[in-house]
């Protein structure tokens, strides 16, 4: 175990364009090779497309999508006497949000063709409507936790 002090958690500053912490977290997940302005442009274009297609506030659609994709429980591998059990554990809020954002970005990238902004907008709108791959991943995670409820007493 490390003898160092725990790293100080940096505060997440809100995104300058949308004034939202969640948006700045999404920009960080979208960013590749330090190209922050490109990631911001992708998010901005995606929000523009969401606004056009739904007529609703894109930031609200985005927040709903993240909320619908955030897992509440997950399974973690725990080794007990030679056997590895999938132990269901609650997910802390920060980790849940981070997982949701990661899933939204990854599933957006795996969507077919078109620009990243269009793919992201599509995934966000699907997630806001309780559809899409990120929401399906959340449901799978919850089902796994439910199936392994018998091992909940191995929690650490």
UniProtKB/Swiss-Prot annotation:
Keywords: Ribonucleoprotein, Ribosomal protein, RNA-binding, rRNA-binding, tRNA-binding. It comes from the Bacteria. It holds the Pfam family Ribosomal_S7. Transmembrane segments: none annotated. GO terms for cellular component: small ribosomal subunit. One of its GO terms (molecular function) is structural constituent of ribosome. InterPro entries: Ribosomal_uS7, Ribosomal_uS7_bac/org-type, Ribosomal_uS7_CS, Ribosomal_uS7_dom, Ribosomal_uS7_dom_sf. GO terms for biological process: translation. One of the primary rRNA binding proteins, it binds directly to 16S rRNA where it nucleates assembly of the head domain of the 30S subunit. Is located at the subunit interface close to the decoding center, probably blocks exit of the E-site tRNA. Belongs to the universal ribosomal protein uS7 family. Part of the 30S ribosomal subunit. Contacts proteins S9 and S11. This is Small ribosomal subunit protein uS7. It comes from Synechococcus sp. (strain RCC307). The gene is rpsG.
């Amino acid at each position: 175990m490390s003898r160092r002090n725990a790293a100080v958690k940096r505060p997440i500053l809100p995104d300058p364009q949308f004034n939202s912490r969640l948006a700045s977290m999404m920009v960080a997940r979208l960013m590749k090779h330090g190209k922050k302005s490109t990631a911001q442009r992708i998010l901005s274009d995606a929000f523009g497309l969401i606004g056009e297609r739904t007529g609703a506030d894109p930031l609200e659609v985005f927040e709903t999508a993240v909320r619908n994709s955030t897992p509440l429980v997950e399974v973690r591998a725990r080794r007990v006497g030679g056997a590895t059990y999938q132990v269901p554990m609650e997910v802390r809020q920060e980790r849940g949000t981070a997982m949701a954002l990661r899933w939204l970005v990854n599933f957006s990238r795996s969507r077919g063709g078109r620009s990243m902004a269009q793919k992201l907008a599509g995934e966000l709108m699907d997630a806001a409507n309780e559809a899409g791959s990120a929401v399906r991943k959340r449901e799978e995670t919850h089902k796994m936790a439910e199936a392994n409820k018998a091992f909940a007493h191995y929690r650490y």
